[in-house]
Amino acid sequence: MDQFFEHLNAGEREAAVALMADNAEMRIHVGDNSQLLRGVERVGGWFLRADKGLKMIPADIRDTGSTYECDVLVVRPGVNSQHLDATFRVEAGRITAINLAPR
């Protein structure tokens, strides 16, 4: 996961997406709703299309082996920063699931 955040925060989005499994899933919670993206094309595309300058800074990391939980500070130019609860599942060295929810 350290590599994922390093690549993402350095603007190397393609390298960050390359760490995802082909069958990756991402659930994004907004208000009372959530959206589920399936497949590396959709999940990776979300990161590739994000605002230029997007940074995701992890803190309060809890790494339990296959699950990586953290508080993520999301910073985007021109927008207020936001804290998210983030959970990542990693299997065989690939990110297979991401869950992002506002704190």
Predicted regions and their residues:
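Short, well-ordered alpha-helical segments enriched in acidic and aromatic residues
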Residues: 12-27
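Short beta-strand edge/turn micro-motifs at domain boundaries
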Residues: 69, 81-103
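Structural motif
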Residues: 20, 64, 91-92
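A short gly/proline-enriched turn/hairpin at secondary-structure junctions
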Residues: 25-35
